[in-house]
């Protein structure tokens, strides 16, 4: 974790994932090999404007929804991810996005609110990568396959 980053005790972070400076993370699970940039806010408290009061005095009465972030996810600079969102493996969140809804595996989203831009790979390639589950390999196997992992997806056809 970098300086000025706050990671609350109710956060689980997978192996090899990192969080850059000035980020705030609570109430979430982050998979392995995730890259989280600076100024990222994950699962900040949301005020329920449907209640009589929006004041956090009633927060102890509310159940917060956990954020789930898959493996090998890239979260760019100054992103906000609201509570309850699920982000699939290999997804990319563009800089400055506010993520209010789930993001599918290998989907690229951006904007306020975050919207679909495109998928990183074809559906066939995504299925192969999901089946491969390389992030579950041990460190020896990963080191032996660095050349493979640094190639484009043409190799999996």
Stretch-by-stretch model annotation:
Residues 50, 101, 105-107, 115:
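Glycine-centered loop/turn positions within well-structured domains
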Residues 78-91, 97-101:
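Beta-rich strand-turn-strand
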Residues 72, 90, 107:
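Catalytic-loop signature of eukaryotic-like protein kinases
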Residues 55-81, 113-157:
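C-terminal segments of enzyme domains that contribute to small-molecule binding surfaces
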Residues 93, 111:
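Conserved G/P- and acidic residue-centered "switch" motifs that form tight phosphate/ATP-binding loops
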